[in-house]
Regions:
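Conserved glycine(s) of the Walker
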Residues: 254-256
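Short helix-coil-helix linker/hinge
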Residues: 31-36
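Short capping segments at the starts of secondary-structure elements
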Residues: 43-52
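DNA-recognition alpha helix
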Residues: 53-64
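Hydrophobic positions on the alpha1 helix immediately C-terminal to the Walker A/P-loop
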Residues: 259
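A noncatalytic interaction/capping subdomain that flanks phosphate/NTP-handling catalytic cores
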Residues: 5, 9-24, 37, 64, ...
Length: 388
C-alpha cells in the first residue's frame, strides 16, 4: 500500500510523520507517533490491503485474549482512518463529494452508457438526442462537484500544454483545465467507472460558459473510454452518400465545411457531422457512430452508418487526386485522430485502428480548390471506387 506526502523522521528520538511536496502545499500537519503507530506505518509500506496489515500486527503483538485482539484491531483501524483523512496512503478508493442537489441523467453515446449526477443546469442540451431512460448499471458515472478536494491528487505528468495538463497516479487520471474559467479539474478513476468534474462557485451569469466547459470536459473522458472500446474520433466533416458515410478530413480552416457544402449543393447529400466523427472498429468493417461534439458547425447525428472512405483534403490551385502509399494512408489517417496519445500504448492503438481502416475503406488525398470542380472530381473517384 503506497504512502504519499509524508516521511517518517525522528526529531530528538521522537517519531514524527513530516509532510513534503504536495503535502506542504496543502498545509497538512506533522503527526506525532508512538511505538505502535510507527509499526503500523511500517506495515502500511509493506502490505497491500487493510486485512494484511491488521493480520501482520496481530501476529506481532500477540494479544492475550479475544477482547484485546478486538481492541487492537480497532486501534489500528482508527489510526489508519486518521491517516486517510490526510490523504496519506493509497486505499484504492475513489471519493466523491457532491455538495448540492443533483439530477440523475442517463445517456448513451456510440453504445457507451453513461450516468450524469450533478447540476441539471450544467448538462448540455447537445446531449438531448442521446438521452436514455435506463439509469441502472452505467458504464461510467460522471459527477459534478463544487469544490476541489482539500488534499490535491498528484501524479506523473503525461501531457502538458497551454490548454490542459494530464497526470496519472495509481488510482486515477487527473485533467487540469488550464484555460477554463469554471471547470478546474476532472478526475477519472483507473477502472473507468467514476469521473468527477470540479468547478468553481457559479453565479447566474456563469452557467452558460460553465455548461460549455462541462460539455467539452466530458468529451475528454469520452475519447478515452471510446478508445478502450476500439472506437476512435477523427477530425473531419462527413456526408451521407449512397448509404455510406464519407469523411473529409483536414486541419481547421482548410475547407472541410466548404467541401461538404459543395456536395450538398451538387448532389443533395446531408451532412452527418460538421467537425468530428467516431470510427468504430468491428471484426469485419468500420462504422461511423454519432456523437454530440461537432465543433462550431452545429451539425451532429446520433445514428450509425458504414464507413465508405476518408478523403484527406489539402488546398491547392489545381484540383487533383494525389495517390498515397499504404504507409501514407495509415500515417496520415492516424494523424487526424484526436483520440488520446498520452502513452505509447495509446499511440499503438491508434496506429492499429488506422491500419484496419486502410484495409476496409477508401483513403485518398484530394488536392483541391474551393470550386465545384473539386467536389465533382472526388465524386467521380468515389463512384469508381464503389464499382470495384
Amino acid at each position: 500500500m503506497k504512502t504519499y506526502n509524508y516521511t517518517l523522521q525522528y526529531i530528538d528520538n521522537i517519531p514524527y510523520l513530516i509532510p513534503f511536496g504536495q503535502g506542504i502545499s496543502d498545509h497538512i500537519p506533522s503527526i506525532l507517533l508512538n511505538k505502535t503507530s510507527v509499526m503500523i506505518w511500517d506495515a502500511i509500506n509493506v502490505y497491500e490491503t487493510n486485512e494484511e496489515i491488521v493480520s501482520h500486527l496481530i501476529q506481532t503483538f500477540q494479544p492475550d485474549n479475544e477482547n484485546e485482539k478486538i481492541e487492537l484491531e480497532n486501534d489500528i483501524k482508527q489510526f489508519m482512518k486518521h491517516l486517510e483523512m490526510y490523504n496519506i496512503f493509497d486505499n484504492q478508493s475513489f471519493h466523491v463529494l457532491v455538495p448540492y442537489k443533483t439530477k440523475n441523467i442517463a445517456f448513451h453515446i456510440a453504445g457507451i452508457s453513461m450516468l450524469y449526477i450533478g447540476l441539471e443546469s450544467l448538462f448540455s442540451e447537445n446531449f438531448a438526442p442521446f438521452l436514455s431512460s435506463e439509469e441502472s448499471m452505467p458504464e461510467i458515472t460522471i459527477y459534478t462537484s463544487l469544490t476541489l478536494p482539500h488534499f490535491k491528487s498528484v501524479g506523473t505528468i503525461l501531457v502538458r500544454s497551454d490548454d490542459i495538463t494530464i497526470c496519472e497516479n495509481d488510482n486515477e487520471y487527473i485533467f487540469i483545465m488550464n484555460t477554463y474559467q469554471y471547470v478546474k479539474e476532472c478526475h477519472l478513476s483507473k477502472d473507468d467507472t467514476t469521473c468527477v468534474l470540479y468547478h468553481n462557485e457559479l453565479h447566474p451569469d456563469d452557467y452558460k460558459t460553465a455548461k460549455e466547459e462541462v460539455f467539452h470536459t466530458i468529451r475528454f473522458i469520452f475519447l478515452y473510454i471510446a478508445q478502450r472500446h476500439n472506437m476512435f474520433v477523427i477530425h473531419s466533416a462527413s456526408i451521407l452518400y449512397k448509404d455510406k458515410a464519407w469523411l473529409f478530413s483536414a486541419s481547421s480552416g482548410t475547407g472541410k465545411s466548404t467541401h461538404t457544402t459543395l456536395w450538398k449543393n451538387l448532389y443533395h447529400t446531408p451532412c452527418i457531422n460538421g467537425d468530428l466523427n467516431l470510427l468504430a472498429i468491428t471484426d469485419t468493417h468500420v462504422e461511423v457512430r454519432g456523437i454530440p461534439w461537432c465543433g462550431t458547425s452545429g451539425i451532429s447525428d446520433n445514428k450509425t452508418y458504414p464507413l465508405g472512405g476518408i478523403i484527406l483534403l489539402k488546398q491547392h490551385p489545381i484540383d487533383k487526386i494525389q495517390p498515397l502509399t499504404q504507409a501514407e494512408k495509415i500515417l496520415y489517417t492516424m494523424q487526424r485522430f484526436i483520440s488520446p496519445t498520452w502513452t505509447k500504448e495509446m499511440v499503438q492503438k491508434n496506429l492499429n485502428a488506422a491500419c484496419f481502416i486502410s484495409k476496409h475503406a477508401m483513403i485518398t488525398r484530394l488536392l483541391c480548390t474551393k470550386e465545384s470542380s473539386s467536389a465533382q472530381l472526388i465524386h467521380a473517384e468515389i463512384d469508381k471506387y464503389k464499382e470495384q
